[in-house]
Design a protein with these regions (language model features):
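Second-shell loop/turn segments in exported
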Residues: 65, 89-90, 129-132, 154-165, ...
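Bacterial N-terminal signal peptides that target proteins for export
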Residues: 1-10
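Acidic/histidine-rich, metal-coordinating catalytic segments
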Residues: 183-198
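C-terminal motif of bacterial Sec signal peptides marking the signal peptidase cleavage site
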Residues: 18-19
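Active-site-adjacent loop/helix surface patches within enzyme catalytic domains
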Residues: 30-184
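Acidic, His- and aromatic-enriched active-site or binding-groove loops in soluble protein domains
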Residues: 103-104, 204-229
């Protein structure tokens, strides 16, 4: 796609007024830095905005508002790469058909773009499934990360690395989101995890382990557990019993796979997505001892 000649004239800032109060709600902002760290305004620091009916003949009261019987829409955080540059990403994500709540550019600056309000449904996940739930657009926040993705082919991939300054932005932003919505570690996923075979992003070079160790974001296995499980690897990887157990373990962790005892396309795609996430040095769709042990270790930690 030729992006030359694209000119972005303005980026508008929207200020929202509470419909039922006289106070002006400050715009949702991502402020600047302390010690080279992106600082994000907390959701709880802003006045609560209420959407409710306005009737001419009746008064809708808030005398008993809010009920305690409620929870957040957001249960998942989904990370993507755009596969295009920042300027084109902003253009694509603000037009029809596709969007995300946030865009993290690839500039060494202190800016993150908010594109869709967190209370709204962004169109980023598409056909997706995680933990038995379909259509994750309804229940997730999506972060698009500017990254050119695979510049090679499927047979000879050449994925684009992520610079540290960009991961700092992603880490701080994701940390803020999961804290506010109490998102479980195993519900911080990549697009590849929720749409195996259809989407590869954020790819094998995305530093999931760094996100976990430096920011407490997402899930990661304990090395000790991995090494405990590895000697238990049964080696008979062609056995329907073994394959069914692998499928059961993948499903338990969150992947949408059958339990038919066959390494079919759906199962292999899920294994590749899993390996990209947790063992990116080799993502061939083969359940070797390390892949098997990592899967066991993750379920021991998060799904006992």
């Amino acid at each position: 796609m030729n992006v030359k000649g694209l000119v972005f004239s303005t980026i508008s800032c929207f200020f929202i007024l509470a419909s039922c109060a006289t106070k002006t709600v400050p715009p949702k902002t991502i402020t600047k830095v302390i010690r080279d760290t992106v600082i994000i305004n907390s959701k709880t620091d802003q006045p609560e905005m209420t959407r409710a009916a306005k009737l001419e003949k009746y008064k809708v009261t808030t005398d008993y508002y809010p009920s305690i019987s409620q929870d957040e829409r957001v249960r998942f955080l989904v990370l993507h790469y755009t596969a295009i540059n920042t300027e084109l990403s902003l253009k694509v994500l603000t037009q029809k058909d596709v969007s995300a709540h946030y865009l993290v550019n690839d500039y060494d600056d202190k800016t993150i773009n908010l594109l869709v309000d967190e209370t709204k449904r962004a169109w980023h996940a598409g056909v997706s499934n995680w933990k038995g739930l379909d259509n994750l657009n309804f229940s997730s926040i999506g972060i698009e990360i500017v990254n050119l993705g695979n510049k090679g082919t499927d047979a000879y991939p050449n994925y684009t690395p992520y610079p540290d300054y960009q991961i700092k932005k992603v880490g701080e932003l994701a940390q803020d989101i999961i804290k506010r919505y109490n998102i479980s570690p195993f519900n911080v996923v990549g697009h590849a995890d929720i749409a195996p075979g259809r989407k590869p992003d954020p790819g094998p070079l995305f530093p999931w382990k760094k996100l976990y160790t430096d920011y407490g974001v997402g899930a990661w296995y304990d090395e000790t557990d991995k090494y405990i499980f590895m000697p238990q690897y049964p080696w008979d990887t062609t056995s329907p019993i073994f394959i069914t157990q692998v499928q059961t373990d993948l499903k338990k962790y969150g992947y949408n796979v059958p339990t038919n005892g066959i390494i079919d396309t759906q199962t292999k795609n899920a294994i590749i997505a899993f390996q990209m996430h947790f063992r990116p040095e080799k993502y061939d769709g083969v359940v070797d001892a390390e892949t098997w042990a990592i899967l066991k270790a993750l379920n021991k930690k998060y799904n006992p």
